[in-house]
């Protein structure tokens, strides 16, 4: 009897609770009003009393293309609520059994979409929970009225600037339909995020949910109230099983009807072939949702062309796994010949969206009709700051030098350039976006925008140059220390071999060669360091030039003294005299090569006051006495001369500020990354591997000077044409000058009088005697 009374009381309490479900959000609803759309499917909305997703009441409404239309649809499906605005949800949700229009039953299909929240009554900002070690922040811009996506990006970047992850966020100050003037957000450290994730996993089986015991059948409804952490996140839907104990009678009836729909032979059991056919047909319907574009406006910004899968699990972990599987799929247009612009999410390239011409079928499912929804779906499962490898530059600067110094330096150099390229790419994208937004601005405002980005680019270039200079100087100092250690060790071994009793000449000569090679590398490092400083900072090079020459003289003296010790040991120098002479010839040859190399370098950079030809020649004469045996600054061993990328070589960089290399103005939009040439800041090629800095070059205004090579060729061609015209004109004038008028050939007798001779000349020039002419006319 007691059990019956308890059961009746429980039923009465449940009935009372159901009857008292309020219709005003301020009084509390079991679920927040939301609508979800998937083109080709019937619109879905949440039943605020049960928390379940239900299809459109009319069974005809599908995806809507405008925010005003979405607001109107919210008002239609929730007539009892005062819907005043809509806003995108922060997280995608999974909806089970979402059928295409015209179908009543479908199973085992989960669709992941980003729903719209229908805001009730006067706007009230979301109550965000701030866990331990987290920070609550907000930003408002009264002169801006931006979308949900814009403010989500602002919050995400703000957390990233603080080396934290975006935990939760909400909109502030509505200024239109799905438009706002600010955002509030919570940033948490990565460790706190992981702790909260583990706490949520432990609480997955909990039935605590604001609204009652119906949470087993709810679908990821977002309740934004100041509740505990496990209530702040999406509620965990569970799998609905046919044999679950305590299942309500209504669910049993629906399951029986579904089995009967697939029971074609009347045996009372589900026909698996029919079910498989239905699933295959549903798969075709889903492909049509991606492939058919005739019925869908490509410009609809709210079309949730999301992703589908054939799994029955609906835990939050499985939803994130499905989203990750599709969002991380590689770009594939498919075999079909359609050409539909879409967006795909590149998780490898810094969570960036790229445009993709989707073929309509057979391609990857990672394609979205707008960048907005691509980011909304895919960014939910990607942390704000993806785990990145430790900064190689910091690691290099903090780690002491070892035998792998050159390899560590190369790795740090590549990391530095990659970071610089990433920064420049980000600025380029921001510049292009600002350019698009500034098309209708006055010319003065455009100039301000251009100047701001010019300053930003220049600051990035100067920062990168400073970091490069620090990296190279550190590498030079470490190489010098390593060379000193090697030289000291080689000299100690050489002296030890000389002091042996009796000494072994061949062994002594071998150690002497090692010591000489160490001195050569020290000298080569010193010269390269001076050339680098002379290139990037001539004033500093002028200051250190005396120290460089002194160091080279010290190297020469040490080598001469070491060779002198060889002749103090009886019998050793005589046994290896031939090798010593060969070493002397190599010294002379390498000295000449070094002199030529120095001359070439000086000419390539232009004659300057630091290293004039005559002065350097005198210095070489002083430092390279030919009568010395192994001494001389110019001595370079064949095994180490002009050797590429050895541990003793330092590769100079161009660390000059940007204004010395040309300041960019603005990027040109619409160019592929392959078409954008590389901006290469490089030093002269001095027969050694040099520090070449490659990054993507911003292509700027047309007034920037183009290729000088084309201008030179044009001038040369023009000069040749002008010279040809002048020559032809002179020839023609000269020919005309020597041309005379002749009406015939007249023989002149040498015995005639001067008067007759003069008359003959006049007749040659066309003179006619009027008397003769008169009589000729009379006779005729």
Curated annotation (Swiss-Prot):
SUPFAM superfamilies in UniProt: A heparin-binding domain, Amyloid beta a4 protein copper binding domain (domain 2), BPTI-like, CAPPD, an extracellular domain of amyloid beta A4 protein
CC terms in the record's Gene Ontology section: cell surface; early endosome; Golgi apparatus; Golgi-associated vesicle; membrane raft; plasma membrane; recycling endosome
Its keywords, alphabetically, are: Amyloid, Copper, Disulfide bond, Glycoprotein, Membrane, Metal-binding, Protease inhibitor, Serine protease inhibitor, Signal, Transmembrane, Transmembrane helix
Q: Where are the transmembrane segments?
A: 712-732
Spell out the residue ranges making up region: Clathrin-binding. 769-772
Name the membrane topology term.
Single-pass type I membrane protein
**Chain span(s) of sequence motif YENPXY motif:** 767-772
Q: Which Cys-Cys disulfides exist here?
A: 39-63, 74-118, 99-106, 134-188, 145-175, 159-187, 327-378, 336-361
* Chain segments carrying region GFLD subdomain: 29-124
Spell out the PANTHER family in the cross-references. Answer: ALZHEIMER'S DISEASE BETA-AMYLOID RELATED (PTHR23103), AMYLOID-BETA PRECURSOR PROTEIN (PTHR23103:SF7)
Write the protein's name.
Answer: Amyloid-beta A4 protein
Q: Which organism is it from?
A: Dichotomyctere fluviatilis (Green pufferfish)
Q: Encoded by which gene?
A: app
């Amino acid at each position: 009897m007691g059990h019956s009374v308890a059961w009746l009381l429980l039923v009465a309490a449940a009935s009372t609770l159901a009857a008292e479900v309020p219709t005003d959000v301020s009084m509390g609803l079991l679920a927040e009003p939301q609508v979800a759309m998937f083109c080709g499917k019937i619109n879905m909305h949440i039943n605020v009393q049960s928390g379940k997703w239900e299809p459109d009441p009319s069974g005809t409404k599908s995806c809507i293309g405008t925010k005003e239309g979405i607001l109107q649809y919210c008002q239609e499906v929730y007539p009892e609520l005062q819907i005043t605005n809509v806003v995108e949800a922060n997280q995608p949700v999974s909806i089970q059994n979402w059928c295409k229009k015209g179908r009543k039953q479908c199973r085992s299909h989960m669709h992941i979409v980003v729903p719209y929240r229908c805001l009730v009554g006067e706007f009230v900002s979301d109550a965000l929970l701030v866990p331990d070690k987290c920070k609550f922040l907000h930003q408002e811009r009264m002169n801006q009225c931006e979308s949900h996506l814009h403010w989500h990006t602002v919050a995400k970047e703000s957390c990233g600037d603080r080396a934290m992850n975006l935990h939760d966020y909400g909109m502030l100050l509505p200024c239109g339909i799905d438009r706002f003037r600010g955002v509030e957000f919570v940033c948490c450290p990565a460790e706190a995020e992981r702790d909260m994730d583990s706490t949520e996993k432990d609480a997955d089986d909990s039935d605590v949910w604001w609204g009652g015991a119906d949470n087993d059948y709810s679908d990821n409804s977002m309740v934004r109230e100041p509740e505990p952490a496990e209530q702040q996140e999406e509620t965990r839907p569970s799998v609905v099983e046919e044999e679950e104990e305590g299942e309500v009678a209504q669910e049993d009836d629906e399951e029986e009807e579904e089995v009967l729909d697939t029971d074609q032979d009347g045996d009372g059991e589900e026909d698996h072939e029919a079910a498989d056919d239905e699933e295959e047909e549903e798969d075709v319907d889903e492909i049509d949702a991606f492939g058919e574009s005739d019925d869908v406006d490509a410009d609809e910004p709210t079309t949730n062309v999301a992703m589908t899968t054939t799994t029955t699990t609906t835990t939050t972990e499985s939803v994130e796994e499905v989203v990750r599987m599709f969002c991380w799929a590689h770009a594939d247009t498919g075999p079909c010949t359609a050409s539909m612009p879409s967006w795909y999410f590149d998780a490898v390239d810094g969570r960036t969206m790229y445009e993709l011409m989707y073929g309509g079928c057979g391609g990857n499912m990672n394609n979205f009709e707008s960048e907005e929804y691509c980011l909304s779906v895919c960014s939910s499962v990607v942390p704000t700051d993806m785990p990145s490898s430790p900064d190689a530059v910091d690691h290099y600067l903090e780690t002491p030098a070892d035998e792998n110094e050159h390899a560590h330096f190369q790795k740090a150099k590549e990391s530095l350039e990659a970071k610089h390229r990433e920064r420049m790419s980000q600025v380029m994208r921001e510049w292009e976006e600002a350019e698009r937004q500034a098309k209708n601005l006055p010319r003065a405002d455009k100039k301000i925008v251009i100047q701001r980005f010019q300053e930003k680019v220049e600051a990035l270039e100067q920062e990168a140059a400073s970091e490069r200079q620090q990296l190279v100087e550190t590498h030079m100092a470490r190489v010098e220390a390593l060379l000193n250690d090697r030289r000291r060790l080689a000299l100690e071994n050489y002296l030890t071999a000389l002091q042996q009793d009796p000494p072994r000449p061949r062994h002594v000569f071998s150690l002497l060669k090692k010591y000489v090679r160490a001195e050569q590398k020290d000298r080569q490092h010193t010269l390269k360091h001076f050339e680098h400083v002379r290139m990037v900072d001539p004033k500093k090079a002028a200051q250190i030039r005396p120290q460089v020459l002194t160091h080279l003289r010290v190297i020469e003296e040490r080598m001469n003294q070491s060779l002198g010790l060889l002749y103090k040991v009886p019998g050793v120098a005589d046994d290896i005299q031939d090798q010593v002479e060969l070493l002397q010839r190599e010294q002379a040859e390498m000295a000449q090569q070094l002199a030529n190399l120095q001359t070439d370098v000086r000419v390539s950079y232009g004659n300057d006051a630091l290293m004039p030809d005559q002065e350097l020649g005198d210095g070489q004469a002083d430092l390279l006495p030919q009568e010395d045996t192994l001494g001389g600054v110019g001595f370079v061993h064949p095994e180490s001369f002009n050797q590429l990328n050895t541990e003793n070589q330092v590769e100079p960089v161009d660390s000059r500020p940007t204004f010395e290399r040309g300041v960019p103005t603005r990027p040109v939009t619409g160019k592929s990354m392959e078409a954008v040439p590389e901006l290469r800041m490089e030093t002269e090629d001095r027969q050694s591997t040099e520090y070449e800095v490659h990054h993507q070059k911003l292509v700027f205004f047309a007034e920037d000077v183009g290729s000088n090579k084309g201008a030179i060729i044009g001038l040369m061609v023009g000069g040749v044409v002008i010279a040809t015209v002048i020559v032809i004109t002179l020839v023609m004038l000269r020919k005309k000058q020597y041309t005379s008028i002749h009406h015939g050939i007249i023989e002149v007798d040498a015995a005639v009088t001067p008067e007759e001779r003069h008359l003959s000349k006049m007749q040659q020039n066309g003179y006619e005697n009027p008397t003769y002419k008169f009589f000729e006319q009379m006779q005729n």
